[in-house]
């Protein structure tokens, strides 16, 4: 089949890499425009574009597909002229109007990082961890105009462990997504079968995974330790959980575990011990967490042993 692929970050690049190994013809790749990145603020292509530059495949980077503008209408016409059988979309980042969704012979298929209709939206991996879900997965759906509202065609399941961060879970789901889309597109007959058997989402089960904002990564010591630990894992690698030491300085917290220490009358945010395991801090409901990797401004991430050696934190200190 002739496939258009649309995606931007590593999650999408993993799926594209798998599709490139199949007998299908990737006739075009759509990705977000190059963005400034890094300390030098150099224009940097997306992971999807970086991958596809090794192949002789045309890359398109429209700003949008809005038919109300000349450039948007031109982008729609350009895509239609490609004559694709199907378009695969994974974390593309642009809204696709119905005219685009209807263009390929079999429409547009989306690789979504949750078990829909739970966690529609921008941050399904992070929200699943922060909420304490014990399972997530991949849904392949036929796209509709609404946000992740399309009919479901295929699902895979992935347990969420107590050690999973958004980084580790992302990589597991990226691999599952790649396998899933290749299974759905094994042949034209297979695709027709999954399209015929597709399932409408139950709107009553919908939960939205709202976009992350940096401010919510600030640690709230009044929460119990289990919730603090979930948030630390959910916000790794971005925006990274932090302790606001003062107006200008934040201590980033990369990793934690539930503490085996306790203190009867500890205040929320109080450091009750510092040892080879890490920094033990009191949380809400008389629970305790152990911070095992932290990073001071301008420094690198430190492990438990290095934290103790800095002597920047002390027992009895109340963290804000």
From Swiss-Prot:
It is an enzyme of class 2 (transferase). GO terms for molecular function: methionyl-tRNA formyltransferase activity. InterPro entries: Fmt, Formyl_trans_C, Formyl_trans_C_sf, Formyl_transf_N, Formyl_transf_N_sf, Formyl_transferase-like_C_sf, Met-tRNA-FMT_C, Met-tRNA-FMT_N. Disulfide bonds: none annotated. (6S)-5,6,7,8-tetrahydrofolate binds at residues 114-117. Its EC number is 2.1.2.9. GO terms for cellular component: cytosol. It catalyses: L-methionyl-tRNA(fMet) + (6R)-10-formyltetrahydrofolate = N-formyl-L-methionyl-tRNA(fMet) + (6S)-5,6,7,8-tetrahydrofolate + H(+). Keywords: Protein biosynthesis, Transferase. SUPFAM superfamilies: FMT C-terminal domain-like (SSF50486), Formyltransferase (SSF53328). PANTHER family: METHIONYL-TRNA FORMYLTRANSFERASE, METHIONYL-TRNA FORMYLTRANSFERASE, MITOCHONDRIAL. Attaches a formyl group to the free amino group of methionyl-tRNA(fMet). The formyl group appears to play a dual role in the initiator identity of N-formylmethionyl-tRNA by promoting its recognition by IF2 and preventing the misappropriation of this tRNA by the elongation apparatus. Belongs to the Fmt family. This is Methionyl-tRNA formyltransferase. It comes from Acinetobacter baumannii (strain SDF). The gene is fmt.
């Amino acid at each position: 089949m002739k496939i258009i692929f649309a995606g931007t970050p590593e999650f999408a690049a993993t799926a594209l890499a798998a599709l490139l190994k199949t007998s299908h013809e990737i006739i075009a790749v759509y990705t977000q425009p190059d963005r400034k990145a890094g300390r030098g603020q150099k224009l940097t292509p997306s992971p999807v574009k970086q991958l596809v530059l090794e192949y002789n495949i045309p890359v398109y980077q429209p700003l949008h597909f809005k038919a109300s503008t000349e450039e948007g209408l031109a982008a729609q016409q350009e895509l239609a002229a490609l004559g694709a059988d199907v378009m695969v979309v994974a974390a593309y980042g642009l809204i696709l109007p119905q005219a685009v969704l209807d263009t390929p012979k079999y429409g547009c298929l989306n690789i979504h990082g949750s078990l829909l209709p739970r966690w529609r939206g921008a941050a399904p991996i992070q929200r699943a961890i922060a909420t304490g879900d014990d399972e997530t997965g991949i849904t392949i759906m036929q796209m509709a105009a609404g946000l992740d509202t399309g009919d479901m065609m295929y699902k895979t399941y992935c347990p969420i462990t107590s050690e999973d961060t958004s980084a580790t879970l992302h990589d597991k789901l990226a691999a599952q997504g790649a396998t899933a889309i290749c299974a759905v597109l094994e042949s034209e007959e297979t695709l027709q079968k999954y399209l015929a058997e597709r399932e409408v989402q139950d709107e009553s089960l919908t939960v939205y995974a709202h976009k992350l904002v940096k401010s919510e990564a600030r640690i709230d010591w009044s929460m119990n330790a289990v919730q603090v630990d979930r948030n630390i894992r959910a916000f790794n690698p971005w925006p990274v959980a932090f302790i606001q030491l003062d107006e200008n300085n934040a201590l980033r917290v990369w990793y934690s575990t539930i503490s085996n220490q306790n203190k009867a009358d500890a205040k929320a945010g109080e450091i009750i011990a510092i040892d080879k395991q890490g920094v033990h801090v009191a949380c809400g409901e008389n629970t305790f967490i152990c911070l095992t990797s932290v990073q001071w401004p301008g420094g690198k991430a430190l492990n438990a042993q290095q934290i103790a050696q800095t002597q920047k934190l002390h027992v009895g200190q109340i963290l804000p």
